[in-house]
């Protein structure tokens, strides 16, 4: 399938795909996600039509909490609804996320992941915000590049509808949200072709309606609450297959090979990294550089983080692996490890990889740059089971020593850096 090439950033890529599947967008701007809401508002004003032949109804609320409440109400009324947020704004949505997930409403929250204010505020990128939502019941889908945002945002929307589970569709703030790339874009007819219209109609039929009234939002006593809470299990058990089904549809359309976990590197790798987000592009470049020197290394790119499918992860790891380094872009003080690391340990503990050494590392907090030389340090590390990269930690001595900068750019490439000064 031939697709149009356009130059855009990650925010516009997410907005382009999400607009197609949305009846309503409830918005409140926050850096670095504001561009998604602004683009959606602009397109609706210009009369752009979604796949249903309608303009998206855009409503700006008084806060992110209000936007989340509007998403909840709009979904309950039978309108496919999305929003765009990050950081403290996403935290304000958490109470509503529990309700949206508990009522199995197919909303999509598009997030350009950003740091949370702790010892200081940071408007820059990491995964602190999305990791604060991992127990809400929302599925979580991650993209690594602008092209992946374009390709996989439809998967979040379509899997939410068919799987009856809301999605947090996220990518790295600034590094992906504001990176401008020439990418292949979706035509809305192709997006419409992938949609399950029967599932969409079933969602609309389930809406609150005085012609067939039902009770929602009740309070339950101890005699039934636990049982009712467990009733959602089959939907989460089935969701990884639903996500892969739509990834396969995308693959069929555009010739890609998207999976819940994608492996890149040597077939007989002995040391691999497991990571999410834009760092995977850096890791891939570093793998190519090391492969030229005969190193057997690889990376598993996590796409579907929630629900975490242990078998899909196991299937993605080469049998030859002797050491795994898990990279997390968040910090949970006091925990035994960061979230992705703990999930990997739990997934592999009873598998054929139960004896493989698993190390845990932090990187990129507050948009700290992660370079190929730092990734080389991760692959060369065989002793420090807990580590950081990108900083010099002279307090707790967790940082890995980084060697001289390495050049992974292909020969013949011209690099340019442009500096802009002024208001």
Model region roles, listed by residue range:
Residues 123-173, 197, 353-366:
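Conserved thiamine diphosphate
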Residues 267-295, 308-313:
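Redox- and metal-dependent alpha/beta enzyme cores, enriched for Fe-S-associated oxidoreductases
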Residues 172-211, 315-353, 359:
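Terminal amphipathic helices with adjacent charged low-complexity linkers/tails
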Residues 52-56, 167-262:
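Conformationally flexible catalytic loops at phosphate/diphosphate-handling active centers
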Residues 36-41, 70-73, 93-97, 118-124, ...:
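Short acidic, glycine/serine/threonine-rich loops at helix termini
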Residues 323-411:
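Peripheral docking tails and interdomain loops at the edges
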Residues 1-132, 137, 154, 174, ...:
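Thiamine diphosphate
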Residues 42-47, 285-299, 349-350:
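Short helix-loop-beta junction
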